[in-house]
Amino acid sequence: MNNELLECPCCKNRTLSELGAYEVCPICHWEDDPVQSNEPDYAGGANQNSLNQAREAWEQSQ
């Protein structure tokens, strides 16, 4: 069993135990929605903003 954490699609920190399982990143608070991972411009679903919008906001906050 591999216990290595996986990269958050938003902030790129290794915080997720499984991709697409709707886990919330404890660093950037992105909820890993598989629909938004496949369609990064889609706003709605588990997150109000699209993945691309959230990535941009995260980068600007750093």
Regions found by a protein language model. Name each.
Residues 23-24, 51:
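Intrinsically disordered, low-complexity regions enriched in Ser/Pro/Gly/Gln/His and often acidic
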Residues 8-11, 25-28:
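Short cysteine-rich clusters marking metal-coordination/redox-active sites
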